[in-house]
Amino acid sequence: MQRLLTIFAAITFGSLITCSTVAADEPPAKEADAKPASIFPDANLEAAVRAEVFAKRYNDEPITPEDVANISRVVGKDKKIKDLSGLQHCKALMLLDLESNQVTDLTPIADLKRLQSVTLAGNKISDIGPLAGLTSMQLLDLSNNQVSDLKPLEKMSNLRTLYLAKNTLETIDPIAPLSKIWSLDISDNKIKDLSPVAKLGWLTTLDARGNQIESLSPIVELRELDMLLISGNKISDLNPLVEMCQKDAEGDRRFAPYLEVYLGENPIDEKAKADHITKLESFGVDIYDK
């Protein structure tokens, strides 16, 4: 009996050793594949993009390049967005509205060739160089930033609407070739010369308030104007405006009867101004002198 127990114990011990050896030789079980990281380092931007990704709109799964390859718009107003990294994957993007954020670098959107409408008003942008190749652009709003150089815009020949209010512009020369613009806001800058506007033949609205403009001569050939805002400049002579409106009134009456002019806070002689306003009103022009 004792011998049988000894044999049984030996067999059992040997089995344990064998099992242990086999277990030691087996490769460790694979860990579950880790989820891919989000392509958007800025969580606030990711949230704005997620709203356009139907499959992940209501969960927190990381967004991948494939998820955003075909989205056409991203809207994220006043969301404290700082970093646009990740947007470079949105190859089909046509509309981007990130008004009132903290964006400084536009590099991630430099190759989004389908962009037609970009609103970045109220950010911290000074360099618009990355926009230079976006020639499909039709609406661009850069109001309330720190832009001083418009050269990157000079090939945006499809631009219709351009808002540049409250920047640090001293010249608008680069926009002279952009003949399709019909609405231009350059208010509250440091602009002295309107000459580049002379070639914008389709211009209907010009907001140039709060600059250092002295002469209206460059606008005399603009035949589509219906709103002119020039308050708060250094204009002392309204003759160019009177002459262009008189010419229109005596001709095909294309714009004068529909034109609104805001000209308050300019150093215009009161008597001359009264005479000019009377003439302009006789042509059908609405004058606002406050």
Regions found by a protein language model. Give the residues of each.
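N-terminal compositionally biased, intrinsically disordered segments and leader/signal-like regions
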Residues: 7, 13, 19-22, 105, ...
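Short "repeat-start/strand-capping" segments in structured domains, especially the N-termini
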Residues: 92-94, 113-115, 135-137, 157-159, ...
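Conserved hydrophobic beta-strand positions in leucine-rich repeat
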Residues: 72-74, 96-98, 118-120, 140-142, ...
